[in-house]
Structures are given as structure tokens and as C-alpha cells.
Amino acid sequence: MESIEQSIIPGLPDDLALRCIAKLSHGYHGVLECVSRGWRDLVRGADYSCYKARNGWSGSWLFVLTERSKNQWVAYDPEADRWHPLPRTRAVQDGWHHSGFACVCVSNCLLVIGGCYAPSVSSFPHQKPVVTKDVMRFDPFKKQWKMVASMRTPRTHFACTSVSGKVYVAGGRNLTHSRGIPSAEVYDPVADRWEELPAMPRPQMDCSGLSYRGCFHVLSDQVGFAEQNSSEVFNPRDMTWSTVEDVWPFSRAMQFAVQVMKNDRVYTIVDWGESLIKTRDTDEGEWYNVGSVPSVVLPNHPRELEAFGYGFAALRNELYVIGGKVLKWEESGAGRFDIVRLPVVRVCNPLDRPLNWRETKPMCIPAGGSIIGCVSLEESSPP
């Protein structure tokens, strides 16, 4: 029997031992819990999570939701090179699918915002989809989901990003605005409160959001076409919108196509024919090629295959290409193929030339295939 008074680490004061264990990232928690019952109770306890939260030791996370995962998110720890499933959220009922939501990290938490709940045909054949304004928050310290303040307007397929510690949303659609929503809102995670912003000059639907140079950019589903290169830009400093003529060369088929890294370095994937990574000259606004995403090689298959439906994320100065699917054609030439869902994760440093890709640990069960949501969280200290 272990004594309650037993030291956390024999030979070390408990406050120093707690600090040592708390500095280990979340990917090691499963191993820590196997050391002893005392360590298991420590890692799962409220004092431990509060201690990490006070010091801002969230660690770095890559959150991913894939198809056929029954709405269960998984997370990657780059320090431990480990994936692990998150607790299930109770907001999504069994037999329903969540899509069209936005996911963003702010104040060391993951927010899953809005979207549409649609039933599977077999489970609820007469039930219509429901557009929601709900917001779920995952606390990486407590490892718990919680409902927080809802948006003022239900919306799906909308623009969302974080700027200076607040979350901005705009556009999208719902049952009463099928051609686009002009309204915008901002969320303060400290006050847990949403506030209305001035409406956009024109409604936007099926749009994406980007934080760039301190402003909230709303990119429409038509970006990438020569005649549709304008975007709506909100400046939080003077609370005004402006329409900017600019060039964003990605395809809307890529849901997570733009990543902004340190020093406003912008990267995108252009998935027309082949998957090219481009970066933007911050002064001139021109785009140029950095390299390509490597093809997929399957065991016992002679040809290299192009993936689709993958996610794209930036974490700790590296770019991640996550999951996706490939079509594995039969060699008989009969035109038949299998759809292979990929758990593979590929990483590169975009400053290396040529790009040097490596594979991390593949995603854990139940993840794999097309990416529905992905976002990264990097540790930041409290003010």
C-alpha cells in the first residue's frame, strides 16, 4: 500500500517535484499515470491542472477532427511525438454529424464555434439540419469540454479568426440567410461575452477568416478567381470595414488553406492538379512557390498517389499536412478503385530549401481520412 504522505519524487521537495512533472507536456501524461497510483492521482487532480494553468504551461497542441470519428477530436503533442483522443463532447448527439463550424485557439483553450448538425439518413430520415450558435471550449489543463457563451447569430461556413486575444466571426449562412450573413461579432474569452460589430459592406457565405497584420480578413469562396480577388477587412482599432483588392490563390476546396506564422509570414496550399505550397511577399503581396507536398506511397502499390481532403496547419515554425484520402486504382485497368483513408501526418520547415518533409507518428484511432477541423495551440505565458 502506498502512503498518502509519500513524496512525489523521493529526495526532492514536493514543490520542486510538482514543478518538474508539470513541465512535462500532455503527450507524456499517459506514461506518468502508469508510474504509480500517486502520480496518476496527481496528474488527474485539480491542484495539478490549476498549477499548470497559473503558469501557462499548456504545452503545444494540434487538434484534429476527421470524418468517421464519431465527432471525437484527437490531439498531437510535438514534444512527445504522440497522439491521443480527447474526451467526447456531449454537444453532438449520436447519429448526428457536425460540420461547417469554426475552430480557433485563444487564451490557451480550443473553441469550436457554430456550424451545422445534420443527422445521418438512416438514423433520422425526416429530421432537418440544425444551424447552431453554440460554442464549446476545451480546457487543455482540465482536459474538459464546457459550453460557453453562444454567438448572437447562428451561422455555418463562416469566417473566424483570433486577433489580439479576441475571436472574430463574420458571414456564413443559416436558415434565414441562405445567401449570406452580413453581420459580424467579437468574443472576449476573459469576460465570456459576445458583442455585435458593424455589419460587412456586403453579405458573405462559405467564407474563411484570416488574421493578418492585426486585422480580420474575410475571404470569400470565390478567391482564386481573377474576377473575385476582393476581400472584406475589419480593423479592430477603428472598428471599420474596408474592401481590399488582393490576391489569395488558394482553392476553397481546401478548408484550411492559409496559415500565418511569425513575422506575418503567410503560407497556402494550391491544390489545383498538384499540391503546391506558396508564400507571400509581405511587402509586394506577390506569391511564389516554396515547394510541393510529396505524393503518397502505399505498401504493395506501384504508383505514387495524390492525396485530397487533408488538413493544413502551422505549429512551432513548421507546416503540417494531415490525413486526407487517396484513390487506389486497380492495376487491371477496369476503372475500379478503393478509397484509402490516411492517418499519415507530414511536416516540414518552410524556411528550408528544398523542403525537407518528414513523417510524425500517424493519427491515433479513431482518426483518419478527410479533415473536418484542425487548429494548433502554442503555449503562451499569462500576462
UniProtKB/Swiss-Prot annotation:
Domain of life assignment: Eukaryota
SUPFAM superfamilies per the UniProt record, alphabetical: Kelch motif
UniProt keyword annotations, A-Z: Kelch repeat, Repeat
SMART domains assigned: Kelch (SM00612)
Recorded coiled-coil stretches: none
Kelch repeat feature ranges: 50-103, 109-165, 166-214, 216-263, 318-377
Protein name, entry field: F-box/kelch-repeat protein At1g16250
Keyword Repeat: yes
InterPro entries, per database record: F-box_dom, Kelch-typ_b-propeller, Kelch_1
Keyword Hydrolase: no
Cited Gene3D superfamilies: Kelch-type beta propeller
F-box domain segment(s): 7-54
Species lineage: Eukaryota, Viridiplantae, Streptophyta, Embryophyta, Tracheophyta
CDD domains the UniProt entry points to: F-box_AtAFR-like
